[in-house]
Amino acid sequence: MGKTVVRSNESLDDALRRFKRSVSKAGTIQEYRKREFYEKPSVKRKLKSEAARKRKKF
């Protein structure tokens, strides 16, 4: 999880923006959404092969 310390003379909006950026760079939100629901191993393999096929197409 991202950690942000509010600097002196920094608005809360700026600190929140820095926090959101750090969380985004760390991939926390994407990881949460990926693990929100259980995926069977067969479904994971299917999605992985579809993603590879899509990458190869372009």
From Swiss-Prot:
Ribosomal protein as UniProt keyword: yes
Domain of life where this protein originates: Bacteria
InterPro entries tied to this protein: Ribosomal_bS21, Ribosomal_bS21_CS, Ribosomal_bS21_sf
GO molecular function, one term: structural constituent of ribosome
Alphabetic keyword roster: Ribonucleoprotein, Ribosomal protein
Gene Ontology annotations for the cellular component aspect, listed alphabetically: ribonucleoprotein complex; ribosome
Transmembrane annotation, as ranges: none
One GO term of the biological process aspect: translation
Similarity comment: Belongs to the bacterial ribosomal protein bS21 family.
NCBIfam families in UniProt: S21p
Classification via HAMAP family: Ribosomal_bS21 (MF_00358)
Protein name, as recorded: Small ribosomal subunit protein bS21
Native source species: Latilactobacillus sakei subsp. sakei (strain 23K)
